[in-house]
A protein has these predicted regions:
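Juxtacatalytic substrate-recognition/specificity segment
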Residues: 1-76, 80-88, 92, 146, ...
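Beta-strand-rich binding/interaction modules
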Residues: 17-18, 174, 207-208, 221-288
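Outer-membrane beta-barrel initiation region
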Residues: 265, 275-276, 287-391, 429-432, ...
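Active-site-adjacent bridging/hinge elements
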Residues: 28-32, 51-61, 127-142, 324-326
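Outer-membrane beta-barrel translocator/channel fold
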Residues: 367-450
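Acidic/His/Gly-enriched intrinsically disordered linker/tail segments
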Residues: 72, 76-160
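Residue-level detector of the transmembrane beta-barrel scaffold of outer-membrane proteins
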Residues: 175-177, 210, 331-333, 347, ...
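Amphipathic alpha-helical substructures
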Residues: 14-15, 142-143, 147-231
Length: 450
């Protein structure tokens, strides 16, 4: 099935034999599957073998038959491999979750990490680096990429980007272009320029943005609604391009979760006002199915029902979870501390630190001092600001505070404002980094008779 799938999607393999070995897989594993301990088996042995074989076969298939510069055009190898893997999963395992059978546990039903689809994980791995401001342009030479980007983040975003272009162009323009590109490769050595030329010849749409922005730059994508007005029959809304990255974006209308309309907003239309038939929609959403590898999905929703619609309701989650753009997640964890003057201090920690970094985080931990019979605890707030095109790549502003007792009849309040400036070398592979830390510690102590 995998052999036939690759031949139909990409083109007939030109050699008589292809070797697919365990050693090849171990050199280039499927990250996520290979991180699971042996005693956890969320997937059947048959499925694991199928996915491992699919990844390794596609890798060997492309590397031994596609004549590309492995440094300059490595993103094409990666993009075609991941795009093919996602397409294979859509066709053969459309309902498989990222967590496999673990997703069926009732205890985990409320967790986003247990509910996202198998193909959704690619976007999260890319976001892991983008939110840390460590992502790199897909078109950068392979020897300039940091290891995580080379093996995971850039590889996955390459596949997501080709899938995005496929969804935007429609009419099988991308699959047809892949076949033409592969066939042309049998005649001569091909390059990114040939791939670009073939893609442009198969569509009437302007796709210069795909190569100029998606492939050749680190530009991030973030759209949001600025205003929404509704009537019984129509919706009028404005869209803001927050990062000024000229990329088309799809808008959806949904009714009770079912899609009632979808429309692509082209580059020249963004930062504009649109009016669409409502078709009974109770919500409009940008990039609903994450076709566009967007930096921030949390501001893509607008409810149309209710006098004061709550676009993202609060959701309480125990311990930890993956970021869920549908909700304002508050994670809670029971806590317990001890010191001589407060005694045992049970409490509860409330925070919003999901697996992906966020621009604003809070961490509140109220507790009860059993010895002094008073409230105590800790609290912190932080604002994280990334600078995309500077050696000063991150500034973090934070303030934290704690309140406890230092004597049996006296407490202290500590307030700690802080600014951290992180500086890196222009070469991302250079591990040298500098940290400038500005901090003030303010302590207010009650007087003690002891």
């Amino acid at each position: 099935r995998i052999v036939n799938f690759a031949n139909e999607l990409i083109g007939k393999y030109p050699h008589e034999k292809i070797i697919v070995s365990q050693t090849d897989y171990e050199r280039n594993p499927f990250y996520g599957l290979n991180q699971l301990p042996s005693f956890i088996s969320p997937f059947s042995d048959e499925f694991l073998f199928e996915i491992k074989f699919l990844k390794t076969y596609l890798n060997e298939y492309l590397k031994t038959s596609l004549q590309l510069d492995p440094r300059k055009d490595n993103w094409i190898y990666d993009g075609l491999q991941v795009y093919a893997m996602m397409k294979y999963m859509d066709e053969n395992h459309p309902n498989t979750k990222m967590m496999g059978s673990v997703s069926n546990l009732r205890l985990l039903k409320s967790y986003n990490i247990a509910n996202i689809g198998f193909n959704d994980q690619y976007s999260y791995f890319y976001m892991l680096m983008a939110r840390k401001n460590l992502d790199q342009a897909l078109g950068d030479p392979k020897n300039t990429l940091i290891k995580f980007n080379e093996q995971i983040a850039s590889k996955y975003r390459s596949g997501l980007s080709i899938r995005f272009l496929d969804d935007y162009l429609q009419n099988d323009a991308v699959p047809a272009s892949i076949k033409q590109f592969y066939n042309q490769n049998q005649i001569k050595q091909v390059s990114r320029t040939d791939f670009e030329t073939i893609l442009k010849s198969n569509t009437d749409k302007d796709i210069n943005w795909f190569f100029n922005t998606i492939i050749n730059s680190r530009a991030i994508i973030d759209y949001k609604f600025s205003s929404v007005k509704k009537t019984k029959d129509s919706i009028t809304f404005s869209v803001i391009n927050k990062t000024e990255t000229p990329i088309p974006i799809p808008v959806y209308g949904t009714k009770k979760g079912a899609v009632v309309f979808k429309q692509w907003l082209d580059i020249e239309e963004c930062d504009s006002t649109f009016t669409f038939p409502r078709n009974g929609a109770d919500k409009i959403i940008l990039n609903l199915k994450n076709e566009v590898p967007e930096y921030n999905l949390r501001n893509n929703w607008k409810k149309l029902d209710g006098f004061f619609p709550n676009n993202r309701p609060v959701k309480f989650v125990f311990l930890k979870d993956l970021e869920d753009p549908y909700y304002n997640q508050v994670l809670y964890v029971p806590s317990i501390y001890y010191n001589l003057y407060d005694g045992i201090t049970p409490g509860i920690r409330l925070h919003n630190k999901t697996i992906l970094d966020k621009p604003f985080t809070f961490d509140i931990n109220p507790s009860y001092s059993t010895k002094s019979n008073n409230l105590s605890g800790l609290v912190s707030f932080a604002v994280n600001q990334n600078y995309r095109n500077s050696t000063l790549y991150n500034v973090k502003y934070s303030v934290s505070s704690s309140y406890f007792h230092y004597a049996q009849d006296a407490s202290y309040l500590r307030i700690n404002p802080m600014v951290q400036l992180r500086i890196r070398e222009p070469n991302f592979r250079d591990n040298r980094k500098q940290l400038i830390l500005l901090r003030q510690v303010i302590v207010n102590k009650e007087k003690s008779a002891f």
